A protein has these predicted regions:
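Hydrophobic alpha-helical segments
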Residues: 2-258
Length: 258
């Protein structure tokens, strides 16, 4: 019922602004919300919804806002704002740093999270939730739409199997190399084209890569098309020059220099 009500509100808002959202974007957001409610590789459905609540709360965290203006790598004294006092501190720190100050993520900081009990698979799962929920929420905000209500958690446990070929390549978490695809993740990358590291970043959880690819393709282009697309390859209302200008400005504003 909540989904139906949300769809009706979206339709009303779109009629108000005479704007049409591409169907593939709506469908990709629906898939993000469907997956959000399900048990993940490490987190239960309830824990994933709790992470989503903290993602939304992190955007107005006063402690993060104050630290953003500091010059050092270490944060000042204080605590992150949270919706739940019992929420695990290591998870909270990861969410807030990814949301508000990713430019100051260091290996020492990641190692400290590990020392506090945050495993590499858990790190990747939470990072993927931050990424996907942020995409959906900021899209709604940009169009003046209400945020989607968080879904009800689905009980159960996912049967996660760690990829046998995921290895430490010097990054902060293990990844699957382009020549190490096998089994149920043999099609994870398009090997006909260059595979950037950002495409492999979530590969410790292959299903997360697939969901991220889905968002990437619906909002922009598939990874393999990015270096070579031209205006004749798409039917978007904006040109390649306009898209890349917007992407560059957003990246700069978010301290993303990839």
């Amino acid at each position: 019922m909540a989904v139906i009500c949300y769809a009706l509100r979206v339709k009303i808002e779109l009629m108000k602004f005479s704007m049409e959202i591409r169907q593939n974007i709506i469908e990709s957001h629906d898939r993000v919300w469907d997956e959000l409610a399900k048990p993940g590789a490490v987190l239960s459905g309830e824990e994933r919804i709790a992470v989503a609540r903290e993602i939304r709360a992190a955007r107005t965290c006063r402690f993060c806002i104050e630290n953003k203006g500091s010059l050092g790598l270490s944060p000042g004294l204080g605590e992150h704002e949270s919706t739940d006092p019992s929420f695990p501190k290591a998870r909270l720190e990861l969410i807030h740093r990814l949301m508000n100050d990713p430019g100051r993520i260091t290996r020492a900081w990641v190692d400290n999270l590990r020392a506090e009990g945050l495993g590499d698979v858990e790190y990747v799962e939470i990072a993927s939730l931050v990424s996907s929920v942020c995409v959906v929420d900021t899209f709604c905000e940009a169009l003046g739409l209400e945020l989607r209500p968080l879904p009800a958690a689905i009980s159960g446990k996912k049967n996660y199997k760690r990829p046998a070929t995921a290895e430490d390549e010097g990054a902060y978490v293990p990844m699957i190399a382009v020549d190490m695809l096998q089994d149920d993740y043999s099609d994870l990358y398009d090997l006909n084209h260059w595979v950037p590291n950002v495409h492999r970043a979530f590969s410790l959880i292959p299903d997360v890569v697939r969901l991220a690819d889905d968002l990437m393709a619906s909002h922009y282009f598939p990874y393999e098309s990015v270096p070579r697309y031209a205006d004749q390859n798409h039917e978007y209302a904006v040109s390649k020059t306009q898209m890349e200008l917007i992407a560059s400005r957003v990246s700069i504003n978010n301290d993303c220099f990839y």
